[in-house]
Amino acid sequence: MVDKRESYTKEDLEASGRGELFGAGGPPLPAGNMLMMDRVVKMTEDGGTYGKGYVEAELDINPDLWFFGCHFIGDPVMPGCLGLDAMWQLVGFYLGWLGGEGKGRALGVGEVKFTGQVLPDAKKVTYRINFKRIIMRKLIMGVADGEVLVDGKVIYTATDLKVGLFKDTNAF
């Protein structure tokens, strides 16, 4: 049985990384430093821009986050690829929330634009994912548009984020 709530805590997301949230076959989130969110604040199956699902999640920012110490020394900024990865993570999390099974893999993105940055003095990053297409057959895949906001301002946009779930990733 899938744990299908509208919101999830950091502890819930960490449980997902251990394979405990969506069952043994469900897609886990990354663990440790690669988990790029502190909570999911909203999930709907029929919401969003396209009426096919919506996810909103948040990451609290503080100057002690691991990436600020190495990217870059003297010019700390959150790597843009981590924001992109967070959006892919949320697409896979949503597929698990719908009952999909398998290991999540990012399959691509149409276009990404960076128009701002996350600096150590920011307070919060918000991720918004609007699903365009969900396939739940032999192929399990989500296609979505996403945006990353820092303290309420949109700084990244991505179109056609694609994530698939695979039972066997050896040939991937």
Swiss-Prot record:
Its main location: cytoplasm. It is found in: Cytoplasm. The keyword Cytoplasm applies. Its EC number is 4.2.1.59, 5.3.3.14. CDD domains: FabA. It catalyses: a (3R)-hydroxyacyl-[ACP] = a (2E)-enoyl-[ACP] + H2O; (3R)-hydroxydecanoyl-[ACP] = (2E)-decenoyl-[ACP] + H2O; (2E)-decenoyl-[ACP] = (3Z)-decenoyl-[ACP]. One of its GO terms (cellular component) is cytoplasm. Gene3D superfamilies: Hotdog Thioesterase. Homodimer. Necessary for the introduction of cis unsaturation into fatty acids. Catalyzes the dehydration of (3R)-3-hydroxydecanoyl-ACP to E-(2)-decenoyl-ACP and then its isomerization to Z-(3)-decenoyl-ACP. Can catalyze the dehydratase reaction for beta-hydroxyacyl-ACPs with saturated chain lengths up to 16:0, being most active on intermediate chain length. PANTHER family: 3-HYDROXYACYL-[ACYL-CARRIER-PROTEIN] DEHYDRATASE, 3-HYDROXYDECANOYL-[ACYL-CARRIER-PROTEIN] DEHYDRATASE. This is 3-hydroxydecanoyl-[acyl-carrier-protein] dehydratase. It comes from Yersinia enterocolitica serotype O:8 / biotype 1B (strain NCTC 13174 / 8081).
